[in-house]
């Protein structure tokens, strides 16, 4: 939501991921802005004090890979609104499993 920092978004994403099945989850960043470039500022990472304002677009992602097991990629694109955010994704929340 507006007024939060990119670092606070990182902290929330890490907390939610750890509380929901991956307690040892570690990342140096878990998202980025989307603007002129696909990977734009801010960086959703520790130390990024960029304050979110309405109209900013962010990609929040929590990929996880484990040798011998496989991987999972959770990713949402949101636009910051006056009172929170609006999801731009149209895929829903269903888990898609790819058999290899």
Predicted regions mapped to residue ranges:
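Active-site neighborhoods and metal-handling regions in enzymes and metal-associated proteins
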Residues: 1-100
């Amino acid at each position: 939501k507006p007024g939060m920092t990119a670092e606070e978004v990182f902290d929330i994403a890490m907390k939610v991921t750890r509380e929901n099945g991956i307690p040892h989850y570690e990342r140096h960043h878990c998202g980025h802005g989307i603007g002129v470039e696909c990977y734009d500022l801010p960086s959703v990472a520790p130390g990024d004090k960029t304050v979110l304002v309405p109209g900013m677009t962010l990609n929040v992602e929590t990929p996880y890979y484990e040798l011998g097991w496989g991987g999972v990629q959770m990713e949402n694109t949101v636009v910051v609104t006056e009172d929170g955010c609006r999801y731009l994704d149209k895929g829903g929340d269903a888990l898609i499993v790819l058999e290899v």
